[in-house]
Amino acid sequence: MKSSILVKLETLVERYEEIQHLLGDPGIIGDQNKFRALSKEYSQLEDITQCFQAYLGAKDDLEAAEEMAKDDDPEMREMAQEEVKESKANILRLEDELQVLLIPKDPNDDRNCFVEIRAGAGGDEAGIFAGDLFRMYSRYAERRGWRIEVINENRSEQGGYKEMIAKVSGDGAYGVLKFESGGHRVQRVPATESQGRVHTSACTVAVMPEVPEAEIPEINTGDLKIDTFRSSGAGGQHVNTTDSAIRITHLPTGIVVECQDERSQHKNKAKAMSVLAARITKAEEEKRHAEEASTRRNLLGSGDRSDRIRTYNYPQGRVSDHRITLTLYRLNEVMEGDMDSLIQPVIQEHQADELAAMAEQN
C-alpha cells in the first residue's frame, strides 16, 4: 500500500479516537447539535477504522509467520508457510476493502430522491413503457423497504404516463438509484401490433436527491411564475372542482414543475417547491460535472437524459446496460423489481472509476 494512503488512514483513525473521547465530554453531551454531528462523523469513520485495524493485525500476523518459517523444525516451517500464504491473501483483501472505503462519499447518497420518468419516441407504446418503468421502481422500492409517493403524473390515454415524478423515501435511496438517470429503450411487440413486428420506444429517467429544508437554495419569489389550475385525470377529465393544482416556472432557468396530486393547493405548492429545489440543485451539479468531465473520463456517462443507458428486449428476454456492456437474460425478474443484479455492477464500476482517479492523484 502506498505511503500516502497509509498516512491518510492513520489520520482518519486519529480523528476517530479523538471523537470517541469528545463524545464522553459532558460539554458535548449537553449540546445536542454538536453531539449529533460528532456521532454521525464517528459512525462514518467506524468501518474504515475497524478495517484498518484488521489490516494492521494481518500485517503483524504475516511478520510472525515469516519469522516462524525460519524455524529448524520442518513441520513448524510447513505450518508457518501456510500461515504466510493466508496472511498475504488476507492483506490483499483488506487493502481492496480499504481503497473502496476511502472513496469520497457523495453527501447526497443517504438522501431521499425524486425519480422523474418521461415518455420519449414511440407514441403510446413509450407511455405504456413509462408506466412499466414506474412499476419496476415501485417493486424495487418495496423490496428495499422504501416508501414511494407519486408527486405528479400526466397519464397517457392508452395507459402509462406521458410524464410523472415520484418521491422515493428510504435509507440510501439516492445513492442506489442515481445511476438510473438516462435513456431507457424498449424493444417489443405492442399489443396493438397485428403483424407481430417489434417496435422500439424510449423513455428518459432523471433521479435527483431531495434537498433538506436547511439546504434549500434561496429562491427569489420574483423569479417565480406561479399558475393554478384544476387537477385532471387520464384523458384530461377534471377530478377536482377547485384550482388546487400548481405550476411553478423558475424564470432564470426555465424549469417548470407541476403538482396536482393533493386536494390542497398549499400542499401541492409545498411539494412543487421541493421538486423545484431539487431540479435547480441538480442543474447546478450537472454544470459542475460537465466541467469536471473535461479533465477526466467518466466511464458511466453524465447521467444526462440524452445518454442511452439501457435496453429492455422483450422477445429475447434480455436487458442490457450499455455503460458496462452487461447483458442479463432475466428481463421478467428485473421488471418485477429484482434490480440488484443490474444496479450493483454499475455501482462497482463507478467505484473502480473513482479508484482509478484516486490512483492518478496519488
From Swiss-Prot:
Region ranges (Disordered): 285-311
InterPro entries: PCRF, Pep_chain_release_fac_I, Pep_chain_release_fac_I_sf, Prokaryotic/Mito_RF, RF-1
Keywords from the UniProt entry: Cytoplasm, Methylation, Protein biosynthesis
Keyword Protein biosynthesis: yes
Coiled coil: none
Top-level lineage group: Bacteria
Compositionally biased tracts (Basic and acidic residues): 285-295
Disulfide cross-links: none
Places the protein is found: Cytoplasm
GO cellular component, one term: cytoplasm
PANTHER family xref list: LD18447P
Record's function text: Peptide chain release factor 1 directs the termination of translation in response to the peptide chain termination codons UAG and UAA.
Annotated protein name in UniProt: Peptide chain release factor 1
Organism: Photobacterium profundum (strain SS9)
Gene name, Swiss-Prot/TrEMBL: prfA
